């Protein structure tokens, strides 16, 4: 019965294509009602099929879960991470589809966030992949929902095992058996962003009235789908249960001015706001489980029993003898026993992955209790829960502690507590109503939080320069969604800064309108960032932008952040925690941004915390903060960088008209002919000089490929020519036609012309070649290293494995190197026994992919023995001298494998 149930599921019958077409209709529908109708139709048909399939069975576990986990992939908890993002998917598609790396489609996938002006899909990788895949895929796929889930399970488990080869194999199966439309939705499921235009709350409400509430207290999608399969049957008691993760209660941001009103003019509790990881602990005797605020299981890290983990062994004996079962809510902190202090989360450690030999130890700071000995406490008041909490365990400093609280009545007490938190470099404070009950996944139902950055004027703000950008995704597609900001190296007195160190990436704080306007302002200045040739004026750490902007064309933004924390991702060696843009400093010039010295001073001021000011009560009893003086604005000095100045050609005498009305842009010259000399000579021959190439520029002259030249090459709008061509023109006093040897880069039209005139090595089809030109052509021809048959065999094997052709019978021996016992004396070729069956076997082995050798040496994988076993002992003696041990098999292994079209188990044929 159990076997039949597992094989007979709705998911194993419903085509994945049906789910995708439903999702497509939901996405394309305009109104909410129409979106709901399409989802309800799919859900109803599933339930009807379920009833028909299982009409003779009771207590079946089959449910809507296989489809729901694909519709709401962001709520998936059973499946581990895929380890796949858009860029990795792009590279896999390019490899699996064998797309030319520099081809149009490959570049579309790799640069999916870059606006192209077509389709309007910038930032939507799934849509871009759809258009690339459409001409290459099936019209309709053959996979069921169950098969898709199985393959996704395989990808997740192989990612955990770091088996990239098996991940590729599963992805290849998905690609070859699904249509472009199905893959579009599959990509969105893997990335966990379906863009349906309908919330998870709406999906839950259509599925069942109790679904959202049950998910809040269990975070278990499968349990929701199983328990609420019948929409007519509700749950009488939806409450927190042991060993089932729930979404914790959250705090809303408080307005200090209204704090007494929010607390209903009654007394309230003030607690320290801890800067750790929110974690719930479930305990039943010696069994423990730990869950994060999003329902992820961290039991392996903290310990499932008193004998394992970074926490459980140290706190198990702290619980009172009469406490068998409990559920606690608190913050997991890192504690330094040497300094007896808690570490802030911004420093370089991860409490969820701390190793045993760390100088820090895990400490659980508990502030709530939800169950004790099977008694549920969620509906008890906070005051009552606090009383119970104090009787559950004996605190152990640095291991398990109760978060201390103070009782308060007034706004002034809140301000004093906040100022004290600022002095102690703490994150902030919590304010809680004593009569509040615990409401999972609810924010602000009696719990409030106050952090210095929420209060105007308490934070030191940073004026930093935008130096890079990142294209947006989703609703921000086609515009810059994040910016890379930097501080300046302090320049010599009287000069402007020329080098900038990256500090932080920032994207929040801006409205869509502000983001759009800022992007529009900087749009014409963005340039592609090339990792191998970065701009010399912008120094980066490991974090690199997608595009950059010359500092002199950029703007300063005022940033507010919680603190400055260490980071090797940025050149400054630190970054900002929780940065957000406050405003654009239109009143400041680009060179007036913060310097490295300013940053170091601010960093040392309050241990990196950017809140160092106190909140004060003014005369009108309203919170006030001290105003800071605005920095005096420096007078603008307008000038042109020296190397961009136009040359002074007033004293040049014209000697020829060969370049009359021809515009040149000279980027650089040679050692013997520097840039000014070339410009003077061009003017002598009647040409015009510009410092930046435009639509009328005939060509760009470059003696070396600096950053400006590389950017011109990337634009693909201008021909870039060596100074040697100019010198040839000057020497002959004629307009010498271009030849391949003169060219650094050709724009498309020139490239097309050259393709008609020259072969790929630069040899003209029509003009006679002299000896020197022929030598030059030959020097440009690289030797093609022909591969040996052995190397080709290895290459073929890799290709067969990559594209799953290795299951073909014709390649079954491809990775085998075989020696056949055809010689009376091993390795003596003159003693070959002619006309034996083994000679035929050698041909069959080669036909089916094997490499057959006549010399027994290191690297042989198999030795095949015929009827004569007299040399077996000699072969075994040989084998003992080899690093890699070969297998000695009967010839029937070859015969049986070929007859049955697959490799047979070798152990049955061993000699």
From Swiss-Prot:
Associated clinical condition: LIG4 syndrome: Characterized by immunodeficiency and developmental and growth delay. Patients display unusual facial features, microcephaly, growth and/or developmental delay, pancytopenia, and various skin abnormalities.
Region annotation (Required for catalytic activity) ranges: 610-620
Family: Belongs to the ATP-dependent DNA ligase family.
Name of the featured protein: DNA ligase 4
Binding site for Mg(2+) 2: 427
Gene: LIG4
E.C. number: 6.5.1.1
GO cellular component: chromosome, telomeric region; condensed chromosome; DNA ligase IV complex; DNA-dependent protein kinase-DNA ligase 4 complex; intracellular membrane-bounded organelle; nonhomologous end joining complex; nucleoplasm; nucleus
Domain BRCT residues, every copy: 654-743, 808-911
Annotated PROSITE patterns: BRCT, DNA_LIGASE_A1, DNA_LIGASE_A2, DNA_LIGASE_A3
MF term (GO), any: DNA binding
């Amino acid at each position: 019965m159990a076997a039949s149930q597992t094989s007979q599921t709705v998911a194993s019958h419903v085509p994945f294509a049906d789910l995708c077409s439903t999702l497509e209709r939901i996405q394309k529908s305009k109104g909410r009602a129409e979106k709901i109708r399409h989802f309800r139709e799919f859900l109803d048909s599933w339930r009807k099929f379920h009833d028909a399939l299982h009409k003779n069975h009771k207590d079946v576990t089959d449910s809507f879960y296989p489809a729901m986990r694909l519709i709401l992939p962001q709520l998936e908890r059973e499946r581990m991470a895929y380890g796949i993002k858009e860029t990795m998917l792009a590279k896999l598609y390019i490899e699996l589809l064998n797309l030319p790396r520099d081809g149009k489609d490959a570049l579309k996938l790799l640069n999916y966030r870059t606006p192209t002006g077509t389709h309007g899909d910038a930032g939507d990788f799934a849509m871009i992949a759809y258009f690339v895949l459409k001409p290459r895929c099936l019209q309709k796929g053959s996979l069921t929902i169950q098969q898709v889930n199985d393959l996704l399970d395989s990808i997740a488990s192989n990612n955990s095992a770091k088996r990239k080869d098996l991940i590729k194999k599963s992805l290849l199966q998905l690609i070859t058996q699904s249509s472009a439309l199905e893959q579009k939705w599959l990509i969105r499921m893997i990335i966990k962003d379906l863009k349906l235009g309908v919330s998870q709350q709406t999906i839950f409400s259509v599925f069942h009235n109790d679904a959202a509430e049950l998910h809040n207290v269990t975070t278990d999608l499968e349990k929701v789908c199983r328990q609420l399969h019948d929409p007519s049957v509700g749950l009488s008691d939806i409450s927190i249960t042991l060993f089932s993760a729930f979404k914790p209660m959250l705090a809303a941001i408080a307005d200090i001015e209204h704090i007494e009103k929010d607390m209903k003019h009654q007394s309230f509790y003030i607690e320290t706001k801890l800067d750790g990881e929110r974690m719930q602990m479930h305990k039943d005797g010696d069994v423990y489980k730990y869950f994060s605020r999003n329902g992820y299981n961290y039991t392996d890290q903290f310990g499932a029993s008193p004998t394992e983990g970074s926490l459980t062994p140290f706190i198990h004996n702290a619980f009172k003898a009469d406490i068998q079962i409990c559920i606690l809510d608190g913050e997991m902190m890192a504690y330094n026993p040497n300094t007896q202090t808690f570490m802030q989360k911004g420093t370089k450690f991860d409490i969820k992955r701390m190793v045993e030999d760390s100088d820090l130890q895990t400490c659980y700071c508990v502030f709530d209790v939800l169950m004790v000995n099977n008694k549920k406490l969620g509906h008890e008041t906070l005051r009552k829960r606090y009383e119970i909490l104090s009787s559950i365990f004996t605190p152990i400093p640095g291991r398990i502690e109760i978060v201390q609280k103070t009782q308060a009545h007034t706004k002034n007490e809140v301000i004093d507590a906040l100022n004290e938190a600022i002095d102690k470099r703490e994150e902030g404070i919590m304010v809680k109503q004593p009569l509040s009950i615990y409401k999972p996944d609810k924010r602000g139902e009696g719990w409030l939080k106050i952090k210095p950055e929420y209060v105007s004027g308490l934070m030191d703000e940073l004026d930093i320069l935008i130096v890079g950008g990142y294209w947006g995704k989703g609703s921000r597609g086609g515009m810059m969604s994040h910016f890379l900001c930097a501080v300046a190296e302090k320049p010599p007195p009287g000069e402007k800064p020329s080098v900038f160190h990256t500090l932080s990436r920032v994207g929040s704080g801006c409205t869509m309108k502000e983001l759009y306007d800022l992007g529009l302002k900087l749009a014409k200045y963005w340039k592609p960032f090339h990792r191998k040739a970065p701009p010399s004026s912008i120094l980066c750490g490991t974090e690199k932008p997608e595009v950059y902007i010359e500092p002199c064309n950029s703007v300063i933004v005022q940033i507010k952040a919680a603190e400055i924390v260490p980071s090797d991702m940025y050149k400054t060696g630190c970054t900002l925690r929780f940065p957000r843009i406050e405003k654009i400093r239109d009143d400041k010039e680009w060179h007036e941004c913060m310097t490295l010295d300013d940053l170091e001073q601010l960093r040392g001021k309050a241990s990196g915390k950017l809140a160092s000011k106190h909140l004060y009560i003014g005369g009108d009893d309203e919170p006030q903060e001290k105003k800071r003086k605005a920095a005096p604005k420096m007078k603008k000095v307008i000038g042109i960088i020296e190397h961009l100045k136009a040359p002074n050609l007033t004293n040049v005498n014209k000697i020829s008209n060969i370049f009359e009305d021809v515009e040149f842009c000279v980027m650089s010259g040679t050692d013997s002919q520097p840039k000014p000399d070339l410009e003077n000579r061009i003017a002598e021959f009647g040409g015009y000089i510009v410092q930046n190439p435009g639509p009328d520029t005939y060509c760009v002259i470059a003696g070396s490929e600096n950053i400006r030249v590389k950017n011109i090459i990337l634009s693909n709008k201008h021909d870039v020519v060596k100074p040697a061509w100019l010198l040839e023109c000057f020497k002959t006093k004629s307009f010498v036609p271009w030849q391949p040897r003169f060219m650094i880069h050709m724009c498309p039209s020139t490239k097309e012309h050259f393709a008609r005139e020259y072969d790929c090595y630069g040899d003209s089809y029509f003009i006679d070649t002299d000896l020197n030109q022929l030598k030059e052509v030959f020097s440009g021809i690289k030797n093609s290293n022909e591969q040996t048959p052995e190397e080709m065999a290895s290459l073929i094997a890799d290709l067969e494995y990559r594209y799953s052709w290795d299951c073909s019978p014709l390649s079954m021996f491809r990775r085998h190197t075989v020696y056949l016992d055809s010689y009376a004396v091993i390795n003596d070729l003159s003693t070959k026994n002619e006309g034996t069956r083994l000679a035929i076997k050698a041909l069959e082995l080669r036909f089916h992919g094997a490499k057959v050798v006549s010399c027994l040496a290191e690297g042989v994988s198999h030795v095949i023995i015929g009827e004569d076993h007299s040399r077996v002992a000699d072969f075994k003696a040989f084998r003992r001298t080899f690093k890699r041990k070969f297998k000695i098999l009967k010839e029937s292994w070859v015969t049986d494998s070929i007859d049955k079209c697959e490799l047979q188990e070798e152990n049955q044929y061993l000699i």
